[in-house]
């Protein structure tokens, strides 16, 4: 099986954990091969607005392979007839914090040349960005009258942007990305204002993030559709076709235009995972694999020596149910 065998316009390559360096290094090699077969863009699990200028969020800029990817893209595009594009598809949020929507909405306002005092509605940025604004419903501005007015304003800005579409230019897409990010932040803060126990509230926020990720992926495909397919690289939990994550949403809407390759890990010194038991999914994949390989979905059982604290959960029947193939790193 070869990575170029997959013909989906959006190809999801899952990683089993963010903390095994080999995953991102191999991703770079695989994308270079896909670029030779018509792929024209790659999307990573990083803030979409930050990615407009080649930046990273969620500490992904500290990953050497990510910096190497941007370097390779710049060098490739210096001589390429058809340049390759880099996208982020995540929202500008962390699990327990989210910034103010002010700068995102002000960017759109300035692009449209409007006279709207957004800062008067948002107030101090810290009242939005502090962790208490997410952790305590009583301390979030997400349900305030100003926040509701900002959500109406964000919709109005998007309407004005689309009215400007006949005069489309490169800055229009940048402005739209800021507008959707600002609106998404307002949704996230509104969700944080809903009372409930901690588990319920985190699940609700995760659901909002999944929707924002999916919307970004669909938007990226709208931009890239005429140029070629897109490789999206992220943790398995975001790309799997089952459950309620971004992959499940996108998969339902795109059908067979989306394919998911599940990431699998045999052992890892980086996160302290030893050789898998022979009858586990990973154990069956480990046989005959020297470094890595693409394989059909195997039979087996879920391994128990996982590292949830390092974001590693292992393969299971639910994850594999919608997977087209498995990408196993020995």
Residue ranges and their predicted role:
Residues 88, 232, 260-262:
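Structural beta-sheet core signal
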Residues 1-61, 77, 175, 198, ...:
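Hydrophobic N-terminal alpha-helices or hydrophobic patches in metabolic proteins across all domains
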Residues 7-131:
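Structured, acidic catalytic/metal-binding patches in enzyme active sites
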Residues 44, 232, 328:
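Redox-cofactor binding/interface segments in oxidoreductases and associated redox assembly factors
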Residues 1-9, 19, 238-330:
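C-terminal regions of proteins
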Residues 235:
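Catalytic core of tubulin tyrosine ligase-like
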Residues 96-200, 204-216, 229, 241, ...:
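Extended, H/D-rich, highly charged conserved domains that either
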Residues 67-71, 211-215, 219:
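Short, contiguous clusters of charged residues that form electrostatic/catalytic patches at enzyme active sites
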